[in-house]
From Swiss-Prot:
It comes from the Viruses. Residues 317-486 are annotated as: Interaction with host IRF3. Belongs to the rotavirus NSP1 family. Plays a role in the inhibition of host innate immunity by inducing the degradation of key host factors required to activate interferon production such as IRF3, IRF5 or IRF7. Associates with components of cullin RING ligases (CRLs) including CUL1 or CUL3, which are essential multisubunit ubiquitination complexes, to modulate their activities. Recognizes the host NF-kappa-B regulator BTRC through the presence of a DSGXS motif in the C-terminal substrate recognition domain. GO terms for cellular component: host cell cytoplasm; host cytoskeleton. The integrity of the zinc-binding domain in NSP1 is important for degradation of host IRF3. The pLxIS motif targets host IRF3 for degradation; however phosphorylation of NSP1 pLxIS motif is not required for its activity. GO terms for biological process: symbiont-mediated suppression of host cytoplasmic pattern recognition receptor signaling pathway via inhibition of IRF3 activity; symbiont-mediated suppression of host cytoplasmic pattern recognition receptor signaling pathway via inhibition of IRF7 activity; symbiont-mediated suppression of host NF-kappaB cascade. Interacts (via C-terminus) with host IRF3; this interaction leads to IRF3 degradation. Interacts with host IRF7; this interaction leads to IRF7 degradation. Interacts with host CUL1 and CUL3. Interacts with host BTRC. It is found in: Host cytoplasm, Host cytoskeleton. It comes from Rotavirus A (strain RVA/Pig/Mexico/YM/1983/G11P9[7]). A motif (IKBKB-like degron (ILD) motif) lies at residues 479-483. This is Non-structural protein 1. Pfam families: Rota_NS53.
Amino acid sequence: MATFKDACYHYKRLNKLNHAVLKLGVNDAWRPSPPTKYKGWCLDCCQHTDLTYCRGCSIYHVCQWCNQYGRCFLDDEPHLLRMRTFKNDITKEDLANLIDMYNVLFPVNQKIVNKFINNTKQHKCRNELVPQWYNHLLMPITLQSLSIELSGDIYYIFGYYDDMKNVNQTPFSFVNLIDIYDRLLLDDVNFNRMSFLPLVLQQEYAIRYFSKSRFISEEKRQINHSHFSINILENLHNPNFKIQITRNCSTMFGKWNEACTLVKDIGTYFEILKTSHVEFYDVSPRCRMFTQHKLKAVSKVIKPNYATSNHRALATEVYNCRWCSVNTSFIVWNDFRLRNICDNVLNFIRALVKSNTRIGHCSSQEQIHSYIRDVFDVCDENKWNTSVSGIFNCLESVELDGVHYVLLNHEVNWDVANVLIQNIGKIPQILTLNDVITALHSMIYDWFDIRYMRNTPTTTFTVDKLRQLCARRKIADYDSGLSDVE
């Protein structure tokens, strides 16, 4: 059983404040939720289990039980998860406020300990002090947290997470912030709590405390597209697709890291709860992460042999050719922008091949084919530059005064011609490597200009940022029919 979950269940009965704050979905009646996918720690109840995606940010970080309350660590409502979430630069005073909140919600004194022991002993065969029956009393106060970086902000979600060595398939990594506070002060807080426990339970408490307060922080994990809801990934190739998210909001004022201080003023806390409401947002999935996922999908299904072929048709419209026909039933081709990029890039590369080499048929096995797939993933700059340089080196360039040149005297389609005119000023007959790079960049940037894209989707924005974008009518970014250039 998860220690934090048990503590919330038992301490919820102490008073009105605890009943409001410590209410977890995992301790209530179960309701149906989306299928689970990843193994990790539920941020709401801190247990290690199968996770489903959060309705607030679309990241897998909530269990199927807690999902019914729809809480997200990015909410603007002072529920327990939000009050345990800190952002960016954390001070010693912030951590002191967190410890005070733990002491308010999970007090340990002689009266509390006796009450829980008496309640437990009312059941048959529970006269012994077995740790599993007193799990709620054995939750030490630590500065253990799960951390994630989103849109330049670093979030720390504090809690008591059991079994830290278990499988972690989430983008969250364990971070220990005890050095920002003070080891001796935290030891004193826990030794004081431990002194009220029976001797048998003190040993278990001490083991748990030191194992969770002296660990070495993990390396930061990189968030990627697979950490988001599968529903998003399945619909990315629909240009009109919008992600629907919900956020719990209230009239909560003050700095982000001061939310945990609200439990010290019960009256103010309940006044804020009266203003609680849910806000709905339809946001664009447009971001560097998902764009790279789409471009990689294109690179897997294209036919590099088209670059050495003589077909009159565009790359995505070739049929009945063993080497060049693409499977148009793949979902990736539902996005007309990806079709356009594929057609233009391969048309341009083919024009370069025909202008500079004697390769005459798509059945030829040429070295240049091995570089073509990577030319679509413009997000991976190093691999992309290597790919373009490899293609250029296969074109039998001519060196003049230390600069290599290639010819362009083969026909190109109208889209490619327009790209060359816009970026070079005309349709050139001689190109340098930089000209080739500029042209290929432009064909992709016309639709997906990653230079001006955020790394993660807007689902990872705070409520304040979402409201600002909504007010400026930029929450859905661009109309799907317009390119970045337009």
